[in-house]
Swiss-Prot record:
The protein, known as: UPF0266 membrane protein YobD
Membrane topology qualifier: Multi-pass membrane protein
Annotated compartments: Cell inner membrane
UniProt key word rRNA-binding: no
Organism of derivation: Salmonella dublin (strain CT_02021853)
Main location: membrane
InterPro entries: DUF986
Entry similarity comment: Belongs to the UPF0266 family.
A Pfam family matched in the record: DUF986
This protein's encoding gene: yobD
GO cellular component labels: plasma membrane
Transmembrane segments: 6-26, 45-65, 67-87
Keywords of the record: Cell inner membrane, Cell membrane, Membrane, Transmembrane, Transmembrane helix
Length: 152
């Protein structure tokens, strides 16, 4: 096993740990989930570049008769990238005392101001940061608003 294979195993393990945390652990942290809403995905250009570069590496490894272990590891990395970028949907998860947005816990008392933009983006102003929440279904904005008003 080469150093390249070890690095690939490390990256695959990191992506797998992130996927498991995002899917199974985060919804169970900080109490029961009151509301979980699907968000719009950001641009997919980065993901296309990543999966394309991994596909080029697989092609190079196969055509140069590289190690089969490396080919399998690159394929696993491409599948993990495909899952994280295209199959998994980003979510905002509301709890009793706060919410998870982009895998970061934010308590309700940190919200200083809330606005709704013309194009349906909920803007939350925190102490030093502004959150732009783009929901997939525009009707979910009312649910978010009611939940935050009830819990503040």
């Amino acid at each position: 096993m080469t150093i390249t294979d070890l690095v690939l195993i490390l990256f695959i393990a990191a992506l797998l740990a992130y996927a498991l945390y995002d899917q199974f652990i985060m919804p169970r942290r900080n109490g029961p989930t009151l509301l979980s809403i699907a968000l719009l995905r950001r641009g997919r250009v980065d993901s296309v570049i990543f999966v394309g570069l991994v596909a080029i590496l697989i092609y190079n490894n196969v055509t140069s008769h590289g190690a089969q272990m490396t080919t399998w590891l690159l394929s696993a990395l491409a599948l993990m990238g495909f899952y994280i970028f295209w199959i998994r949907t980003p979510r905002i998860i509301f709890k009793q005392r706060g919410f998870f947005f982009a895998n970061v816990w934010i308590e309700y008392n940190r919200i200083k101001e809330m606005n709704l933009s013309e194009d349906g983006v909920l803007v939350m102003q925190l102490e030093q940061r502004r959150l732009l929440i783009r929901v997939r279904n525009i009707d979910n904005l009312e649910k978010i608003y009611k939940l935050i008003i009830e819990n503040q």
